[in-house]
Amino acid sequence: MKLLKSSLLLLLPFVTANPIPSEDKDIIPGRYIVTLKDGITQEDIEYHKSWVASVHRSNLAAATAAGRPRLETEGIRKFFQIHKMNAYSGAFDDQTAEDIRRNPYVKSVTPDRKVYLADTVVQENAGYNLGHMSSKGRHSFTYRYDSTAGEGIWAYVLDTGINVDHIEFEGRADSGYNAIKNVSNTDNFGHGSFTAGIIAAKTYGVAKKATVISAKAFDTGSSTYDYIFDAYNWVVKNITDSGRQKKSVVNMSISSAKYQPFDDAVDNAFEAGITTVVAAGNDQRDASNNTPASAANAITVASIRFDNGRSLFSNYGSVVDIFAPGERIVSCWIGGNNATRKADGTSVSSPHVAGLVAYLMAIEDLPDPAAVTKRVLDLSIPDLVRDPGEGSPNRIAYNGIQEMNETVIA
Protein backbone atom coordinates (compact mmCIF):
# COMPACT_ATOMS: atom_id res chain seq x y z
CA MET A 1 0.00 0.00 0.00
CA LYS A 2 1.27 3.47 -0.81
CA LEU A 3 0.20 5.08 2.45
CA LEU A 4 -1.07 8.65 2.07
CA LYS A 5 -1.28 8.31 -1.69
CA SER A 6 -4.63 8.73 -3.20
CA SER A 7 -6.37 6.45 -1.83
CA LEU A 8 0.97 -13.50 -17.16
CA LEU A 9 1.62 -13.04 -14.26
CA LEU A 10 5.00 -14.35 -13.77
CA LEU A 11 5.79 -15.69 -10.40
CA LEU A 12 8.64 -13.59 -9.39
CA PRO A 13 11.38 -15.88 -10.34
CA PHE A 14 13.73 -16.15 -7.33
CA VAL A 15 16.12 -13.96 -9.04
CA THR A 16 16.32 -13.62 -12.70
CA ALA A 17 18.71 -11.49 -14.65
CA ASN A 18 16.10 -11.30 -17.36
CA PRO A 19 13.52 -8.51 -17.36
CA ILE A 20 9.84 -9.22 -17.83
CA PRO A 21 9.31 -10.16 -21.49
CA SER A 22 7.85 -7.57 -23.83
CA GLU A 23 4.16 -6.91 -23.46
CA ASP A 24 3.27 -8.19 -26.94
CA LYS A 25 4.91 -11.56 -26.30
CA ASP A 26 3.05 -11.93 -23.01
CA ILE A 27 -0.45 -11.29 -24.39
CA ILE A 28 -2.66 -14.39 -24.71
CA PRO A 29 -4.42 -14.18 -28.12
CA GLY A 30 -8.20 -14.28 -27.92
CA ARG A 31 -8.30 -14.22 -24.10
CA TYR A 32 -9.53 -11.22 -22.10
CA ILE A 33 -10.27 -9.86 -18.64
CA VAL A 34 -13.45 -7.77 -18.69
CA THR A 35 -14.24 -5.40 -15.82
CA LEU A 36 -17.72 -3.99 -15.31
CA LYS A 37 -18.60 -0.49 -14.21
CA ASP A 38 -19.17 0.28 -10.55
CA GLY A 39 -22.72 0.41 -9.27
CA ILE A 40 -24.40 -2.13 -11.52
CA THR A 41 -26.88 -4.52 -9.90
CA GLN A 42 -26.83 -8.31 -9.79
CA GLU A 43 -29.74 -8.25 -12.21
CA ASP A 44 -27.63 -6.15 -14.60
CA ILE A 45 -24.79 -8.65 -14.29
CA GLU A 46 -27.00 -11.63 -15.11
CA TYR A 47 -28.46 -9.77 -18.08
CA HIS A 48 -24.96 -8.90 -19.28
CA LYS A 49 -23.84 -12.54 -19.07
CA SER A 50 -26.81 -13.62 -21.18
CA TRP A 51 -26.15 -10.83 -23.65
CA VAL A 52 -22.50 -11.84 -24.03
CA ALA A 53 -23.44 -15.48 -24.65
CA SER A 54 -25.96 -14.43 -27.30
CA VAL A 55 -23.60 -12.04 -29.08
CA HIS A 56 -20.81 -14.60 -29.02
CA ARG A 57 -23.01 -17.30 -30.61
CA SER A 58 -24.26 -14.86 -33.21
CA ASN A 59 -20.79 -13.70 -34.21
CA LEU A 60 -19.48 -17.25 -34.54
CA ALA A 61 -22.48 -18.19 -36.69
CA ALA A 62 -22.02 -15.09 -38.86
CA ALA A 63 -18.38 -15.96 -39.45
CA THR A 64 -19.38 -19.45 -40.57
CA ALA A 65 -22.12 -18.17 -42.86
CA ALA A 66 -19.75 -15.68 -44.50
CA GLY A 67 -17.12 -18.33 -45.08
CA ARG A 68 -14.62 -16.56 -42.83
CA PRO A 69 -12.19 -18.55 -40.70
CA ARG A 70 -13.98 -19.36 -37.46
CA LEU A 71 -12.03 -19.22 -34.22
CA GLU A 72 -13.70 -21.60 -31.79
CA THR A 73 -13.78 -19.69 -28.51
CA GLU A 74 -15.53 -20.70 -25.31
CA GLY A 75 -16.98 -17.36 -24.21
CA ILE A 76 -17.11 -16.39 -20.55
CA ARG A 77 -14.80 -18.63 -18.49
CA LYS A 78 -14.93 -17.40 -14.88
CA PHE A 79 -16.67 -14.57 -13.05
CA PHE A 80 -14.99 -12.67 -10.20
CA GLN A 81 -16.46 -10.46 -7.49
CA ILE A 82 -13.83 -8.77 -5.33
CA HIS A 83 -15.59 -6.36 -2.98
CA LYS A 84 -17.19 -3.78 -5.32
CA MET A 85 -15.31 -4.99 -8.39
CA ASN A 86 -17.13 -7.26 -10.85
CA ALA A 87 -15.10 -8.85 -13.63
CA TYR A 88 -14.82 -11.97 -15.75
CA SER A 89 -12.34 -13.80 -17.92
CA GLY A 90 -13.25 -15.08 -21.34
CA ALA A 91 -12.14 -16.33 -24.72
CA PHE A 92 -13.74 -14.40 -27.58
CA ASP A 93 -13.35 -13.76 -31.29
CA ASP A 94 -12.31 -10.23 -32.26
CA GLN A 95 -15.83 -9.07 -33.12
CA THR A 96 -17.29 -10.26 -29.82
CA ALA A 97 -14.47 -8.60 -27.89
CA GLU A 98 -15.22 -5.34 -29.70
CA ASP A 99 -18.96 -5.66 -29.03
CA ILE A 100 -18.27 -6.23 -25.33
CA ARG A 101 -15.97 -3.20 -25.25
CA ARG A 102 -18.86 -1.03 -26.50
CA ASN A 103 -21.39 -2.40 -24.01
CA PRO A 104 -22.62 0.30 -21.59
CA TYR A 105 -22.03 -1.93 -18.55
CA VAL A 106 -18.35 -2.46 -19.39
CA LYS A 107 -15.48 -0.46 -17.89
CA SER A 108 -12.60 -2.17 -19.70
CA VAL A 109 -11.66 -5.11 -21.92
CA THR A 110 -8.01 -6.01 -21.44
CA PRO A 111 -6.13 -8.85 -23.16
CA ASP A 112 -5.13 -11.56 -20.72
CA ARG A 113 -1.39 -11.86 -20.30
CA LYS A 114 1.30 -13.93 -18.66
CA VAL A 115 2.45 -13.26 -15.12
CA TYR A 116 5.77 -14.47 -13.77
CA LEU A 117 7.36 -15.86 -10.66
CA ALA A 118 10.81 -14.62 -9.77
CA ASP A 119 13.58 -16.99 -10.96
CA THR A 120 15.53 -19.12 -8.55
CA VAL A 121 19.24 -18.72 -7.99
CA VAL A 122 21.09 -21.07 -5.64
CA GLN A 123 23.80 -19.40 -3.54
CA GLU A 124 26.02 -20.38 -0.66
CA ASN A 125 25.66 -19.01 2.88
CA ALA A 126 22.34 -17.94 4.35
CA GLY A 127 20.65 -17.17 7.64
CA TYR A 128 21.22 -13.49 8.35
CA ASN A 129 17.75 -12.45 7.23
CA LEU A 130 15.74 -13.19 10.37
CA GLY A 131 18.37 -11.55 12.55
CA HIS A 132 18.10 -8.54 10.28
CA MET A 133 14.35 -8.33 10.96
CA SER A 134 14.86 -7.96 14.72
CA SER A 135 18.09 -5.94 14.94
CA LYS A 136 17.04 -2.65 13.39
CA GLY A 137 18.67 -3.46 10.07
CA ARG A 138 22.06 -4.28 11.55
CA HIS A 139 24.07 -7.47 11.18
CA SER A 140 22.92 -10.24 13.49
CA PHE A 141 22.41 -13.99 13.37
CA THR A 142 20.09 -13.94 16.40
CA TYR A 143 16.36 -13.61 15.80
CA ARG A 144 14.40 -11.99 18.63
CA TYR A 145 10.61 -12.12 18.57
CA ASP A 146 7.51 -12.17 20.73
CA SER A 147 6.48 -15.71 21.66
CA THR A 148 3.02 -15.30 20.06
CA ALA A 149 4.90 -15.61 16.74
CA GLY A 150 1.85 -15.11 14.52
CA GLU A 151 -0.33 -17.66 16.31
CA GLY A 152 -3.97 -17.40 15.26
CA ILE A 153 -3.15 -15.61 11.99
CA TRP A 154 -3.75 -16.91 8.47
CA ALA A 155 -1.29 -16.11 5.68
CA TYR A 156 -2.59 -16.79 2.17
CA VAL A 157 0.09 -17.58 -0.41
CA LEU A 158 -1.01 -17.02 -4.03
CA ASP A 159 1.68 -18.99 -5.79
CA THR A 160 2.56 -22.53 -7.00
CA GLY A 161 1.07 -24.37 -4.04
CA ILE A 162 2.67 -25.38 -0.75
CA ASN A 163 4.47 -28.56 0.31
CA VAL A 164 1.99 -28.94 3.17
CA ASP A 165 3.68 -32.08 4.54
CA HIS A 166 6.99 -30.30 5.12
CA ILE A 167 8.05 -30.76 8.75
CA GLU A 168 8.81 -27.04 9.02
CA PHE A 169 5.08 -26.22 8.89
CA GLU A 170 4.20 -28.53 11.81
CA GLY A 171 0.73 -29.14 10.38
CA ARG A 172 0.05 -25.41 9.96
CA ALA A 173 -0.15 -25.52 6.15
CA ASP A 174 -3.31 -26.08 4.11
CA SER A 175 -3.80 -26.71 0.39
CA GLY A 176 -6.64 -24.20 0.23
CA TYR A 177 -7.63 -23.66 -3.40
CA ASN A 178 -6.41 -24.64 -6.84
CA ALA A 179 -7.43 -22.42 -9.77
CA ILE A 180 -5.81 -24.68 -12.38
CA LYS A 181 -7.97 -27.51 -13.70
CA ASN A 182 -6.47 -30.97 -14.15
CA VAL A 183 -3.40 -30.10 -12.06
CA SER A 184 -2.92 -31.31 -8.50
CA ASN A 185 -2.71 -28.99 -5.50
CA THR A 186 0.84 -30.23 -5.00
CA ASP A 187 3.64 -27.69 -5.34
CA ASN A 188 5.53 -28.99 -8.37
CA PHE A 189 7.75 -25.93 -8.75
CA GLY A 190 8.90 -25.00 -5.24
CA HIS A 191 8.32 -21.26 -5.32
CA GLY A 192 5.17 -21.32 -3.17
CA SER A 193 6.71 -23.61 -0.56
CA PHE A 194 9.74 -21.33 -0.34
CA THR A 195 7.72 -18.15 0.18
CA ALA A 196 5.40 -19.88 2.66
CA GLY A 197 8.45 -21.02 4.61
CA ILE A 198 9.73 -17.48 5.00
CA ILE A 199 6.35 -16.48 6.38
CA ALA A 200 5.72 -19.31 8.82
CA ALA A 201 8.30 -22.15 8.93
CA LYS A 202 9.44 -23.08 12.44
CA THR A 203 13.09 -22.46 11.54
CA TYR A 204 13.00 -20.06 8.59
CA GLY A 205 9.79 -18.14 9.25
CA VAL A 206 9.17 -14.64 10.54
CA ALA A 207 5.82 -15.68 12.10
CA LYS A 208 6.63 -19.18 13.28
CA LYS A 209 3.17 -20.12 14.54
CA ALA A 210 1.01 -18.66 11.75
CA THR A 211 -1.05 -20.87 9.43
CA VAL A 212 -0.26 -20.73 5.71
CA ILE A 213 -2.97 -21.40 3.14
CA SER A 214 -2.21 -22.03 -0.52
CA ALA A 215 -4.12 -20.40 -3.37
CA LYS A 216 -2.55 -22.11 -6.36
CA ALA A 217 -2.50 -20.03 -9.55
CA PHE A 218 0.81 -21.25 -10.99
CA ASP A 219 2.20 -24.70 -11.77
CA THR A 220 5.39 -23.43 -13.41
CA GLY A 221 7.14 -20.07 -13.48
CA SER A 222 4.34 -18.34 -15.37
CA SER A 223 0.56 -18.18 -15.40
CA THR A 224 -2.19 -15.88 -16.69
CA TYR A 225 -4.57 -13.41 -15.08
CA ASP A 226 -7.44 -15.80 -15.72
CA TYR A 227 -6.02 -18.11 -13.02
CA ILE A 228 -4.67 -15.32 -10.83
CA PHE A 229 -8.00 -13.49 -10.67
CA ASP A 230 -9.69 -16.79 -9.85
CA ALA A 231 -7.28 -17.58 -7.00
CA TYR A 232 -7.37 -14.05 -5.58
CA ASN A 233 -11.16 -13.99 -5.82
CA TRP A 234 -11.23 -17.20 -3.72
CA VAL A 235 -8.81 -15.74 -1.17
CA VAL A 236 -10.86 -12.57 -0.70
CA LYS A 237 -14.10 -14.55 -0.38
CA ASN A 238 -12.56 -17.06 2.04
CA ILE A 239 -11.27 -14.29 4.29
CA THR A 240 -14.43 -12.18 4.23
CA ASP A 241 -16.85 -15.11 4.57
CA SER A 242 -14.99 -16.26 7.69
CA GLY A 243 -14.73 -12.73 9.10
CA ARG A 244 -10.93 -12.98 9.35
CA GLN A 245 -9.96 -9.65 7.78
CA LYS A 246 -8.04 -8.52 10.89
CA LYS A 247 -6.33 -11.89 11.19
CA SER A 248 -5.27 -12.52 7.58
CA VAL A 249 -2.59 -11.37 5.17
CA VAL A 250 -2.05 -12.23 1.49
CA ASN A 251 1.39 -12.64 -0.10
CA MET A 252 1.89 -12.44 -3.87
CA SER A 253 5.48 -12.84 -5.03
CA ILE A 254 4.47 -12.35 -8.66
CA SER A 255 4.97 -9.75 -11.35
CA SER A 256 3.91 -8.69 -14.82
CA ALA A 257 3.95 -5.51 -16.84
CA LYS A 258 1.46 -2.92 -15.58
CA TYR A 259 -2.05 -4.44 -15.63
CA GLN A 260 -4.66 -2.06 -14.27
CA PRO A 261 -7.54 -4.55 -13.82
CA PHE A 262 -5.55 -6.54 -11.27
CA ASP A 263 -4.24 -3.44 -9.51
CA ASP A 264 -7.92 -2.52 -9.15
CA ALA A 265 -8.63 -5.96 -7.66
CA VAL A 266 -5.95 -5.46 -5.00
CA ASP A 267 -7.36 -2.03 -4.17
CA ASN A 268 -10.87 -3.48 -3.86
CA ALA A 269 -9.59 -6.17 -1.50
CA PHE A 270 -8.07 -3.39 0.59
CA GLU A 271 -11.47 -1.70 0.78
CA ALA A 272 -12.88 -5.05 1.94
CA GLY A 273 -10.39 -5.02 4.82
CA ILE A 274 -7.70 -7.30 3.39
CA THR A 275 -3.95 -6.63 3.60
CA THR A 276 -1.95 -7.70 0.53
CA VAL A 277 1.85 -7.77 0.40
CA VAL A 278 3.58 -7.95 -2.99
CA ALA A 279 7.03 -8.09 -4.52
CA ALA A 280 8.47 -5.02 -6.22
CA GLY A 281 9.87 -7.10 -9.10
CA ASN A 282 13.33 -8.06 -10.30
CA ASP A 283 13.72 -5.93 -13.43
CA GLN A 284 16.07 -3.20 -12.18
CA ARG A 285 13.47 -0.56 -13.08
CA ASP A 286 10.80 1.64 -11.57
CA ALA A 287 8.23 -0.67 -9.97
CA SER A 288 5.39 1.57 -11.17
CA ASN A 289 5.74 -0.33 -14.46
CA ASN A 290 4.83 -3.62 -12.74
CA THR A 291 1.65 -5.22 -11.40
CA PRO A 292 0.78 -5.84 -8.61
CA ALA A 293 3.69 -3.74 -7.33
CA SER A 294 1.95 -0.61 -8.61
CA ALA A 295 -1.36 -1.28 -6.82
CA ALA A 296 -1.98 1.79 -4.67
CA ASN A 297 -3.04 -0.21 -1.63
CA ALA A 298 -0.59 -3.09 -1.67
CA ILE A 299 2.46 -3.15 0.58
CA THR A 300 5.21 -3.29 -2.04
CA VAL A 301 8.54 -4.75 -0.95
CA ALA A 302 11.96 -4.26 -2.55
CA SER A 303 15.13 -6.24 -1.80
CA ILE A 304 18.31 -5.49 0.13
CA ARG A 305 21.56 -7.40 0.51
CA PHE A 306 23.27 -8.44 3.75
CA ASP A 307 25.07 -5.06 3.82
CA ASN A 308 21.82 -3.05 3.36
CA GLY A 309 22.60 -2.15 -0.23
CA ARG A 310 19.66 -2.38 -2.61
CA SER A 311 19.92 -5.64 -4.54
CA LEU A 312 21.12 -5.03 -8.07
CA PHE A 313 18.10 -6.87 -9.48
CA SER A 314 15.50 -5.10 -7.34
CA ASN A 315 12.94 -2.70 -8.71
CA TYR A 316 12.64 0.65 -6.95
CA GLY A 317 10.69 3.92 -6.98
CA SER A 318 7.89 5.74 -5.22
CA VAL A 319 5.48 2.78 -5.32
CA VAL A 320 7.88 0.81 -3.11
CA ASP A 321 6.88 0.94 0.55
CA ILE A 322 9.72 -0.84 2.31
CA PHE A 323 12.86 -2.96 1.89
CA ALA A 324 13.49 -6.43 3.35
CA PRO A 325 16.20 -9.08 2.95
CA GLY A 326 16.18 -10.72 -0.47
CA GLU A 327 19.57 -12.36 -1.04
CA ARG A 328 21.12 -15.61 0.19
CA ILE A 329 17.91 -16.73 1.90
CA VAL A 330 17.20 -20.35 2.87
CA SER A 331 13.67 -21.74 3.17
CA CYS A 332 11.47 -24.78 2.51
CA TRP A 333 11.50 -26.62 -0.81
CA ILE A 334 9.89 -29.58 -2.56
CA GLY A 335 11.02 -33.16 -3.09
CA GLY A 336 10.77 -34.25 0.54
CA ASN A 337 9.33 -33.24 3.88
CA ASN A 338 12.59 -31.62 5.00
CA ALA A 339 13.89 -30.21 1.70
CA THR A 340 15.43 -26.73 1.68
CA ARG A 341 16.94 -24.34 -0.82
CA LYS A 342 18.69 -20.96 -0.96
CA ALA A 343 17.40 -18.19 -3.21
CA ASP A 344 17.38 -14.48 -4.03
CA GLY A 345 14.71 -12.08 -5.28
CA THR A 346 12.00 -9.65 -4.33
CA SER A 347 9.88 -12.82 -4.22
CA VAL A 348 11.92 -13.56 -1.11
CA SER A 349 11.63 -10.04 0.32
CA SER A 350 7.83 -9.89 0.10
CA PRO A 351 7.11 -12.85 2.42
CA HIS A 352 9.42 -11.36 5.06
CA VAL A 353 6.97 -8.46 5.28
CA ALA A 354 3.91 -10.71 4.98
CA GLY A 355 5.34 -12.65 7.92
CA LEU A 356 5.91 -9.40 9.77
CA VAL A 357 2.27 -8.44 9.19
CA ALA A 358 1.13 -11.81 10.58
CA TYR A 359 3.46 -11.35 13.56
CA LEU A 360 2.08 -7.88 14.34
CA MET A 361 -1.55 -8.93 13.85
CA ALA A 362 -1.09 -11.56 16.56
CA ILE A 363 0.10 -9.11 19.21
CA GLU A 364 -1.63 -5.84 18.35
CA ASP A 365 -5.18 -4.78 17.57
CA LEU A 366 -4.79 -3.47 14.03
CA PRO A 367 -8.30 -2.68 12.80
CA ASP A 368 -7.79 -2.44 9.05
CA PRO A 369 -5.17 -2.59 6.26
CA ALA A 370 -4.38 1.11 6.59
CA ALA A 371 -3.51 0.59 10.26
CA VAL A 372 -1.45 -2.48 9.38
CA THR A 373 0.55 -0.59 6.78
CA LYS A 374 1.06 2.39 9.07
CA ARG A 375 2.36 0.12 11.83
CA VAL A 376 4.79 -1.66 9.49
CA LEU A 377 6.11 1.68 8.23
CA ASP A 378 6.23 3.28 11.69
CA LEU A 379 8.39 0.41 12.97
CA SER A 380 10.72 0.47 9.96
CA ILE A 381 14.30 1.69 10.33
CA PRO A 382 15.08 4.77 8.19
CA ASP A 383 18.14 5.81 6.23
CA LEU A 384 20.09 2.54 6.18
CA VAL A 385 19.49 1.44 2.58
CA ARG A 386 22.44 2.24 0.36
CA ASP A 387 21.39 3.35 -3.13
CA PRO A 388 17.65 2.72 -2.64
CA GLY A 389 16.95 3.89 -6.19
CA GLU A 390 15.33 7.04 -7.50
CA GLY A 391 12.12 7.88 -5.64
CA SER A 392 12.36 4.94 -3.23
CA PRO A 393 11.65 5.31 0.48
CA ASN A 394 14.69 4.54 2.63
CA ARG A 395 13.07 2.10 5.08
CA ILE A 396 14.03 -1.39 6.27
CA ALA A 397 11.49 -3.77 7.82
CA TYR A 398 11.82 -4.30 11.58
CA ASN A 399 9.66 -6.24 14.04
CA GLY A 400 9.92 -3.78 16.93
CA ILE A 401 11.14 -6.34 19.44
CA GLN A 402 13.34 -3.89 21.31
CA GLU A 403 10.14 -2.10 22.27
CA MET A 404 8.40 -5.33 23.37
CA ASN A 405 8.97 -8.26 25.68
CA GLU A 406 11.22 -10.72 23.88
CA THR A 407 12.03 -14.35 23.40
CA VAL A 408 15.57 -15.03 22.20
CA ILE A 409 16.44 -17.81 19.79
CA ALA A 410 20.20 -18.19 19.32
Curated annotation (Swiss-Prot):
Its biological purpose: Secreted subtilisin-like serine protease with keratinolytic activity that contributes to pathogenicity.
Domain Peptidase S8 as annotated: residue spans: 127-410
Any one cellular-component term (Gene Ontology): extracellular region
Transmembrane spans: none
PROSITE patterns xrefs: SUBTILASE, SUBTILASE_ASP, SUBTILASE_SER
Active site: D159 (charge relay system), H191 (charge relay system), S347 (charge relay system)
Signal peptide: 1-17
Compartment annotation: Secreted
Organism annotation: Coccidioides posadasii (strain C735) (Valley fever fungus)
Documented EC number(s): 3.4.21.-
BP GO terms, sorted: proteolysis
Keyword hit for tRNA-binding: no
Propiece residues: 18-118
Source species, domain of life: Eukaryota
Pfam families xrefs: Inhibitor_I9, Peptidase_S8
Name listed for the protein in its UniProt record: Subtilisin-like protease CPC735_003880
Carbohydrate-modified residues: N182, N238, N251, N338, N405
Keyword Secreted: yes
